[in-house]
Amino acid sequence: MMVPPEYGGSGADTVSYVLALSEVAYSCASTAVVMSVHNSIVCESILRNGTEDQKKRYLSKLATGEIIGAFALTEPNAGSDPSRQTTKAVFDGDSYILNGSKRFTTTGKNAG
């Protein structure tokens, strides 16, 4: 919802997004979690930290629902405590190598 129009989103402000999220949560908490992960974690992370190429490549598809974002936090020996996690991302040349394991990936089954 908060993805700017230049990337295919509606450009909703934070208050409007939270009000919409609250209304969704009244009806279905699970759907609100998916909405929150998709918008607050995935889209917002790309907006704040992504390259211009990544923003152009992913945000319009995320904003229209063509693809769904996912979030992997929980690890077998750390639970959801980020201070105990051991998964690492190491930059190698022009890409990242990921090593580790996750127990749950929120919306992982439907992620694009």
Predicted regions and their residues:
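Glycine-/proline-rich flexible loop or hinge segments
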Residues: 1-8, 25, 39-43
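Short, conserved beta-strand segments within well-ordered enzyme catalytic domains
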Residues: 1-2, 19, 34, 70-72
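Glycine-rich, Trp-frequent "lid" loop and neighboring beta-strands that shape
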Residues: 7-10, 53-112
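Glycine-rich loop at the start of a catalytic domain that most often binds anionic cofactors/ligands
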Residues: 8-25, 47-50, 86
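Catalytic-loop motifs flanking and including active-site residues across diverse enzymes
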Residues: 13-16, 38-42, 112
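Structured helix-beta-strand junction loops
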Residues: 27-30, 64-65
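Active-site PLP-lysine loop of aminotransferase-like
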Residues: 29-35, 102
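N-terminal glycine-rich flavin-associated loop
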Residues: 33-53, 79-82
